[in-house]
Structure formats: C-alpha cells, structure tokens
Amino acid sequence: MSVKPIPGILRPCISSVLPKLDGGVNVILDVGANADCKADVLYQFGILGSLFAEHVCGVQTPRVGLLNIGEEESKGNMLTIAAHEMMKDSTDFNFCGNIESRHLFDDECDVIVCDGFSGNVILKQAESVYSLIKQRQIEDDYFDRFNYENYGGTPILGLNNCLLYTSPSPRDSCA
C-alpha cells in the first residue's frame, strides 16, 4: 500500500504536542513539513489538528487557535490575516482566535495552527529550554514532560495511512 495524502488534503503536516501547565497537551501543527503555507492549508491544519485532539487526545470539542503576534483579528502578516478570515466562521472546527506564543503552554486552546517554519522554531526552543533545565539540574515533573526522548515519533497528519516522523538526536547520529 502506498502512503499518499487523503483526497482533498492539500498538504500533510507534522504534528506534535506541548504540555499544558495544568495538565493535558496542546497539539501543534505544522512543526516542519511545510515552511511556506497558504491560508487554505492552515485552515486544513485546523481540521486535522481538531480531529487528532478529539480522537487521539480525547478532547471534546477542541479549541483551535492560530499562532500569531497578537490576539486581535487585524494583527499578523498577510498569511495569518487571511487564515484568520477563513477560520473565524469555520463550521469544521471550534476556532478560538489568534494565540500569542506566551500562551503556548496555557489552556487557551487545544490545537495551535502555524506554518512548519514557525512550528519547528517553537519545537526546537522547547527542546532547548528542557536541555537548559536539565543542565541546571532542576527537577520538576512538568518539565520532564518536555523530554523529547520519551516520544518515539510524532504523527504526520493528512495521509491515508499511519506514518510517524522520527528525528535522531545529534548524539545518536553516525560521526
């Protein structure tokens, strides 16, 4: 069987999870498959993320947020403004508006939609903060949930079959 996009899906995306401070996770997508996106692609990420949060993470009526530099509708670049315009009246998912990066680990939403460039930067930053915390020998159950070595892989959503993306850590690579 070949693996290909589900009919109607413009671009599959890599999803990941960010631990919420008070329990649970925020699904974030895309985290690296699509560095450049159009508004309709981000809209589809909202659908895929909402379905994943509901059926895999067990969230009833997931709230979908669009990563942006401000909470106001008029904030952002041309992409996020156009995506917000499409998402705000969605009947395909429960859109809760723009989400600023300071709310990534809050309970403001359950799904965070962004392009793969931004999502990958966020993911790498979370990994970096976890590494700094461990180097400082800070023990905390919440921060232990950021340990990427505990995750075998992360799903690529929008495909007709299950496919996990895995990335070896630099220390596991051949020299």
List PLM regions with ranges.
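Glycine-rich phosphate-binding loop
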Residues: M1, K75, T80-F143
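Glycine-rich phosphate/diphosphate-binding loop of Rossmann-like nucleotide-binding domains
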Residues: K38-G97
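Short beta-strand and adjoining strand-loop segment in the mid-core
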Residues: V31-A35, E71-E73, S167
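Conserved small/polar residues in nucleotide/adenosyl-binding loops
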Residues: Y165-D172
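Short glycine/serine/threonine-rich phosphate/pyrophosphate-binding segments
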Residues: M1, L10-P12, K38-A39, V121-I122
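Short, acidic/small-residue loops that bind anionic groups at enzyme active sites
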Residues: S2-G32, S90-I99, R136-F143
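A structural-propensity feature for long, helix-poor, extended segments
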Residues: L21-A35, G153-C162
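Short beta-strands and strand-loop turn motifs
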Residues: V27-D30, R63-N68, D115
